[in-house]
């Protein structure tokens, strides 16, 4: 029999509200609407299908405060992650939303009405401290709107999915599936990465020790920027399944938006798997860790997550399986947890960074590390040969610094090289074609650069070479552009055209600097608006000291050293 849900009752709102579907659907058409983002859709889906039981809606202030302060909902139930719905001041004002209002929650992808929220509270967004490099803090600072609105949900329609539909089990469906298979003890395994031989060995060990079966339950909602896309990962999981003994493992997909919250996230993940019927949950090394902070240090200790779930072991109601990192023993061709390996025994490991480098460069990945069928999928779909991958060259500098001339010359050189299409995004062209309505305020300049980054990222992902040459005077804009392109799997090279301002003015044949000095042009970079020199440029050049030809050659050499041209 499957594990009981967290709180004792599975809050399957879709099933509970089904008898009132026609009534709710009709009402939803008459109400003001909030169009949900991708992350909000992930949260709503797991509220409506019971994955977040005992929640029945988005948190109110008391629940939010209790969860943030001591991992407790207002009713005392353990819950470690705030689940909130944010909305802008404009949405609040336009729809006159206040406590007691009912509002439709709508899917941005197909404009379908999904649920009705009865607002219990509306509160201004709190201000949080924390390291700005943490994904959750970064999301909060850049994406979250002005207000939180909380209240109970009434389900109208389930979300439509068009990928891997047969693998998307709701908690109720997964419980029925376990019952059909006759499974009574289920070990759930959480992952946002491809699985390799070590993961197979770890999950089989856990199942063997507890006489259980395995639920491979990867996240296919929002994960960490730069992660391998879920389409590729699911194909890799499917290729791995036959490596388990027949009937031991099932693959199910979880539409979760991860927060990379380490210890708190581990507790949350355990609750979610309990709601899906699992009796055991694996928590490994650095569970849901976001990587390094702004000081280059890990946000959490490697086993902080294990300590957190151990603290609430009895209350969680799901047995947590704690594992050390496993390592390969070549002399016996087996994997063992590191704490079980005797001193002096030879071990082999490939780090995540090294694996990504090998995939990117096509270097050999040994069978002791991963299965050939998994590697084949990853190489073919997530890491094609470097010489066929796209990239973005982002030139930044003062107006008339020479970046446009460099960009045009580089475009010609890359076209002659062949092998990929080349797109040129000059600052003036983008301003005319994509951003004609924008001015030159700091926010408009930032928006302009983000539009360039969006276009560059999509083209780079498709295998093109993109040369962008805006002034891009602000560090935050350039950093966001790098993250946008890299987040889509593309390589981003920042070239600082560090031509001195005096030289730019002296060689300005159009007289634009002179107009700015006379006050005829306001907010001009270098005159009455600052240019923030890049902190982490991949290449620094100077047209006052170098020819355009030599600078283009430097860029080509940089690309060649990274493997972007065929090597015979």
Curated annotation (Swiss-Prot):
Highest taxon above the source species: Eukaryota
Chief subcellular location: cytoplasm
Residues that, per the record, bind 3'-phosphoadenylyl sulfate: 428-431, 445, 471-472, 510
Binding residues for ATP: 190-193, 284-287, 326
Region of interest (Catalytic), residue spans: 163-388
Annotated stretches, region: Allosteric regulation domain: 389-568
Matching Pfam families: APS_kinase, ATP-sulfurylase, PUA_2
Reactions mediated catalytically: sulfate + ATP + H(+) = adenosine 5'-phosphosulfate + diphosphate
Location of the active site: 191-193
Regulation: Allosterically inhibited by 3'-phosphoadenosine 5'-phosphosulfate (PAPS).
Entry's Gene Ontology molecular function annotations: adenylylsulfate kinase activity; ATP binding; sulfate adenylyltransferase (ATP) activity
Site (Transition state stabilizer): 196, 199
Listed EC numbers: 2.7.7.4
Chain positions of site Induces change in substrate recognition on ATP binding: 323
Keywords from the named record: Allosteric enzyme, Amino-acid biosynthesis, ATP-binding, Cysteine biosynthesis, Cytoplasm, Methionine biosynthesis, Nucleotide-binding, Nucleotidyltransferase, Transferase
Compartments, record wording: Cytoplasm
Binding residue positions for sulfate: 190, 192, 288
Region spans: N-terminal: 1-162
Pathway noted in the entry: Sulfur metabolism; hydrogen sulfide biosynthesis; sulfite from sulfate: step 1/3
GO annotations of cellular component type: cytoplasm
Function: Catalyzes the first intracellular reaction of sulfate assimilation, forming adenosine-5'-phosphosulfate (APS) from inorganic sulfate and ATP. Plays an important role in sulfate activation as a component of the biosynthesis pathway of sulfur-containing amino acids.
Assembly and binders: Homohexamer. Dimer of trimers.
Annotated domain remarks: The adenylyl-sulfate kinase (APS kinase) is non-functional. It is involved in allosteric regulation by PAPS. PAPS binding induces a large rotational rearrangement of domains lowering the substrate affinity of the enzyme.
PANTHER family xref list: SULFATE ADENYLYLTRANSFERASE
Family: In the N-terminal section; belongs to the sulfate adenylyltransferase family.
Protein name as catalogued: Sulfate adenylyltransferase
Species whose genome carries this gene: Aspergillus terreus
Gene this protein is translated from: met3
């Amino acid at each position: 029999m499957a594990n009981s849900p967290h709180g004792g009752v599975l809050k399957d709102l879709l099933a509970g509200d089904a008898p009132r579907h026609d009534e709710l659907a009709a009402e939803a058409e008459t109400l003001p609407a909030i169009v949900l983002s991708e992350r909000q859709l992930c949260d709503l889906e797991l509220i409506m299908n019971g994955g977040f039981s005992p929640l029945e809606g988005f948190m109110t202030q008391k629940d939010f405060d209790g969860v943030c302060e001591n991992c407790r909902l207002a009713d005392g139930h353990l819950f470690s992650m705030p689940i909130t719905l944010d909305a802008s001041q404009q949405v609040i004002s336009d729809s006159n939303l206040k406590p007691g209002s009912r509002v439709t929650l709508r899917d941005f992808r197909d404009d379908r009405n999904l649920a009705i929220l009865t607002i219990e509270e509306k509160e201004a967004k709190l201000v949080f401290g924390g390291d700005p490099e943490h994904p959750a803090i970064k999301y909060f600072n850049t994406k979250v709107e002005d207000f939180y609105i909380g209240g109970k949900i009434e389900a109208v329609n389930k979300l439509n999915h068009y990928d891997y539909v047969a693998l998307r089990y709701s908690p109720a469906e997964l419980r029925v599936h376990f019952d059909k298979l006759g499974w009574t003890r289920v070990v759930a395994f959480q992952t946002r990465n491809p699985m390799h031989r070590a993961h197979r060995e770890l999950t089989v060990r856990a199942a063997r020790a507890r006489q259980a079966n395995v639920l491979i339950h990867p996240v296919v909602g929002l994960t960490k920027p730069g992660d391998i896309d879920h389409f590729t990962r699911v194909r890799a999981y499917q290729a791995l399944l036959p490596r388990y003994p027949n009937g031991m493992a099932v693959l199910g997909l979880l539409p979760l938006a991860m927060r990379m919250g380490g210890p708190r996230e581990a507790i949350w993940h355990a609750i979610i798997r309990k709601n899906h019927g699992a009796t055991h949950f694996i928590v490994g090394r650095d569970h849901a860790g976001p990587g390094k902070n702004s000081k280059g240090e890990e946000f959490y200790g490697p086993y902080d997550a294990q300590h957190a779930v151990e603290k609430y072991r009895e209350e969680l109601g799901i047995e947590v399986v704690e594992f050390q990192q496993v390592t390969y023993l070549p002399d016996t061709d087996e994997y063992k947890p590191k704490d079980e390996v005797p001193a002096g025994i030879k071990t082999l490991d490939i780090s995540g960074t090294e694996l990504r480098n090998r995939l990117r460069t096509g270097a050999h990945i040994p069978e002791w590390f991963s299965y050939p069928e998994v590697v084949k999928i990853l190489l073919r779909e997530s890491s094609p040969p470097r010489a066929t991958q796209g990239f973005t060259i982002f030139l930044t500098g003062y107006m008339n610094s020479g970046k446009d001339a460099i960009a045009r010359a580089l475009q010609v050189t890359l076209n002659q090289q062949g092998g990929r299409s080349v797109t040129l995004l000059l600052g003036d062209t983008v301003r005319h074609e994509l951003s004609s309505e924008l001015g030159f305020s700091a926010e408009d300049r930032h928006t302009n650069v983000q539009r360039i980054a969006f276009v560059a990222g999509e083209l780079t992902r498709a295998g093109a070479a993109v040369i962008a040459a805006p002034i891009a005077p602000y560090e935050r804009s350039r950093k966001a552009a790098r993250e946008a392109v890299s987040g889509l799997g593309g390589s981003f090279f920042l070239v600082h055209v560090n031509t001195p301002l005096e030289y730019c003015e002296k060689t300005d044949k159009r007289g634009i600097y002179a107009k700015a000095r006379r006050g005829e042009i306001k907010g001009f970079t270098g005159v009455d608006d600052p240019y923030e020199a890049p902190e982490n440029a991949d290449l620094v050049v100077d047209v006052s000291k170098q020819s355009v030809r030599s600078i283009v050659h430097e860029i080509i050499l940089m690309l060649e050293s990274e493997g972007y041209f065929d090597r015979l």
